[in-house]
Amino acid sequence: MIDAKSEHKIAPWKIEEVNALKELLKSANVIALIDMMEVPAVQLQEIRDKIRDQMTLKMSRNTLIKRAVEEVAEETGNPEFAKLVDYLDKGAAIVVTEMNPFKLFKTLEESKSPAPIKGGAIAPCDIEVKSGSTGMPPGPFLSELKAVGIPAAIDKGKIGIKEDKVVAKEGDVISPKLAVVLSALGIKPVTVGLNVLGVYEEGVIYTSDVLRIDEEEFLGKLQKAYTNAFNLSVNAVIPTSATIETIVQKAFNDAKAVSVESAFITEKTADAILGKAHAQMIAVAKLAGDEALDDDLKEQISSSAVVATEEAPKAETKKEEKKEEAAPAAGLGLLF
């Protein structure tokens, strides 16, 4: 905290700035420190417009941000919050929001945009210039292209590039001349935006390597974990709000199966037990000779044979219908 003795040595605007930063730091649950040193003014304004309704961005000097963070940590009795200053680096700024750290990180990543590379910068990837017309009339630019090793000539009244050319490999230092040429060609090999240094939420500080996740892979793992937990709950008979219905249904089906197999008649299983006994009786009767059967059994065997004969064509018809339905569907599948 800025005491009275030191107050006269500090510029009033700095005291006001620290107080404003402290109020901002106390205003939200999620606090992020970001690096915006390499962001050109045009791109920065575009980013501000994109994130305006989702978070608050405040730029300040690193020394003032450090002081504000430390004072808030002291005033709130939260030493973990003070550790956020360990992530101050380069041209830092503060972002406060109610978004969770992962959503915040994703939003900031999506707000990034391509930009020209500057002379002296390191190539983030192989930079290739494609063949074709530049759309520019003959002039000094032709010499500039050749000076950086790009094969160029006049073609149909315009400067054209003869062939594809890799002008820089990943990790190369870009010369000022090459940077000018790439910018003139509209080649933007770098992505600029707000880079997360650290995000604080409820005593935990997240860094970008933790926040950068593959969403599809993460959701797949989450679904698998849920399925495994669900199956464990059902099989171990540990009821939860999500599994109680399945557990009860499984218990009912198991009890019903035991009742039918053991011929233990209940209100729910009487029909199944009698049906099973009748089917077994018919099966045994079919094995016996006609002389061992009375007229009633012969009639039942005959009836069961007729029913089986009638059901067989129906089953075949259903199979054919399914095949016919599947054929157009398969054909449509080839269109996508």
From Swiss-Prot:
Keywords: Ribonucleoprotein, Ribosomal protein, RNA-binding, rRNA-binding
GO terms assigned for molecular function: large ribosomal subunit rRNA binding; structural constituent of ribosome
GO cellular component, as recorded: cytosolic large ribosomal subunit
Biological process (GO), any one: ribosomal large subunit assembly
Residue stretches of biased makeup (Basic and acidic residues): 311-326
Region Disordered: start-end pairs: 305-336
PANTHER family in the record: 60S ACIDIC RIBOSOMAL PROTEIN P0, LARGE RIBOSOMAL SUBUNIT PROTEIN UL10
Function: Forms part of the ribosomal stalk, playing a central role in the interaction of the ribosome with GTP-bound translation factors.
Family: Belongs to the universal ribosomal protein uL10 family.
Subunit record text: Part of the 50S ribosomal subunit. Forms part of the ribosomal stalk which helps the ribosome interact with GTP-bound translation factors. Forms a heptameric L10(L12)2(L12)2(L12)2 complex, where L10 forms an elongated spine to which the L12 dimers bind in a sequential fashion.
Protein's recorded name: Large ribosomal subunit protein uL10
Species this chain originates from: Methanococcus vannielii (strain ATCC 35089 / DSM 1224 / JCM 13029 / OCM 148 / SB)
